[in-house]
Amino acid sequence: MKRIALFFCFIFSFAAHANNIIVNGTRFIYPGNEKEITVQLSNTADRPALATAWLDNGNADATPDTITTPFIITPPISRVDAKSGQTLRIKLGSNAGLAKDKETLWWLNLLEIPPVEASQKNEGQNILQLAIRSRFKFIYRPAGLGNRDAAAEKLALSANGSSLSVSNPTPFYITVSRISRNGGKALNSKTVMFAPQSSQTIALSSAVSKGETLTVNNINDYGADVAVKVTVK
């Protein structure tokens, strides 16, 4: 892990370019009854790249050597050849300390480090490389929590003038992307994630009334936007 932390000491480049390593998802769910899950990396570039992966518990500034996690990523550092792929395996070492009655959220980090061109090495010039970091939601879901697809329908909405109190009584993380009247103009200005058994207040562009039925869009396990109808209490 100390070796991974050294990557954060790199000086970033003067030039920016898009990620060459593509990940096969926008979020990852670890079912409690599975031995491991896999994450597929694909290098779309014409040159190899180094990729390092680690999990954090929400502190994006924490370096890998300071993070304690029950999960093991293999390999933590890998070379992904040009036009090729690499499979990361994530295994739960021990579920001690993890809640058994609700989901736990982690973040999967991927740091892509492009190679130094041979011509630059030969010229003996100082090289500033750009390391590109991406973060993905990584949710541990204990077995026996029930149907995640129906979770958003259980959200409790309470009108409070031009704001809306939203309570999530379920054991699941629910990300609400949009609230509207019958799929019309969005009443909310930003996406909000609700932790299990938590509440938040959302500012709305116009007031809603008790008894009104709203369309609530939430993001499912596959990153798709799914609309459900919820009545304001």
Curated annotation (Swiss-Prot):
Record keywords: Chaperone, Fimbrium biogenesis, Immunoglobulin domain, Periplasm, Signal
Taxonomic source organism: Klebsiella pneumoniae
Cell compartments where the protein resides: Periplasm
Protein name: Chaperone protein MrkB
Listed SUPFAM superfamilies: PapD-like, Periplasmic chaperone C-domain
Family that this chain belongs to: Belongs to the periplasmic pilus chaperone family.
Biological process according to GO: cell wall organization; chaperone-mediated protein folding
GO cellular component term, pick one: outer membrane-bounded periplasmic space
Role: Mediates assembly of pili by forming soluble multimeric complexes with pili subunits as an intermediate step in the assembly process. This protein is involved in type 3 pili assembly.
